[in-house]
Amino acid sequence: MTKNIKNTITVLCIALSCNHIDTFAQEYSKYLQAVDEYQPAPGQFVNELPEYELGDDAAAMAAKCTESLTTGGIVSLGGFGGYITFHFDHSISNVPGKRDLYISGNGYNGNSEPGIVMVMRDDNGNGLPDDTWYELAGSADTDSIGKVIYNYSITYTPNPMGNIPWTDNQGNSGEMKRNGYHQQEYFPAWIDTNLTFTGTRLPNNATNKGTDTQPYYFLTSLRYGYVDNASRTDTTACSFDISWAVDAERRPVTLDRIDFVRVYCAVNQQCGWIGETSTEITGAEDLHLTESLQSTAISSPIDDNADHNDIYSLSGHRRPAMVRGLNIIRNDRGEVRKVVVR
């Protein structure tokens, strides 16, 4: 006899959200699981953090980023536009009234290298970051009106072992200059074509508090909402609320959860002997793991009329195949079970 799929999934959800949610949470980690994409812009730490080795491609570099960020290391995103995309082993819930994500860099007072956070919900359920990105709007939207450049675009041109030329869509051009402290190639070594990035450009935040002959650059922190903008020990400054999400037109977007996170360097700035301003990232975590799992577990039920032998997310989206994390499987007898893919 075929069981009612809605009743079955509801029972499963209740089990997850009540008696067994704490045990279930032990199967998951609050820390990021893996890096999906690593595309830095040119910079003095590129090809070093992480280290490029001959033959590495984009996938190999992403794997090195995963290794670094899950073992206490650091990843540099280079200049404006350079980004990293990563995921957790579960969806992160947008908990009302709370910040949801902690993302750390290597910032400190006077050395803010702000990166913008973008988030994505896996709406098509395929486990890939190929749905719609939303920016988490930070304080510059209100504190620097008229100074933020939206839809800013920059193109870098390879110039092996030399300064890296760039042009932007504002009619400007310049160079990512080499310095004496880093002797490796500054352009990502696994790429041999122009690199173009588009995003929100924040105002320059560097002030020379020294002299022309003895410069001392102070990089002022923004009020909130950016990675590598403050010390990692300042958990409030390094925390982000999914409720800050906006679409491409800067309109607020309501997201119940997210599955992918992207951080990109949001300034195009050179600071003399210090070099370019480049966002770094050292880790990320879900600030409320149990609540994320519980919220996901009580999402909407699966359609009664679905075919057998199907795979679903807990929110009821049909999947073409199992993905990492929790999958709901209905077999040919109409029975439902959970399968966790690590």
Model segments located where?
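Bacterial Sec-dependent N-terminal signal peptides
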Residues: 1-26, 298-299
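C-terminal tail/sorting-segment detector
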Residues: 4, 326-342
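Predominantly extracellular/luminal cell-surface or secreted proteins
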Residues: 118-122
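Acidic, glycine-anchored loop motifs typical of Ca2+
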Residues: 123-132, 148
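Residue-level detector of functionally pivotal "anchor" positions at catalytic/ligand-binding pockets or at interdomain
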Residues: 292-318
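Short, surface-exposed loop/turn motifs with a glycine/proline- and acidic-biased composition
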Residues: 312-333
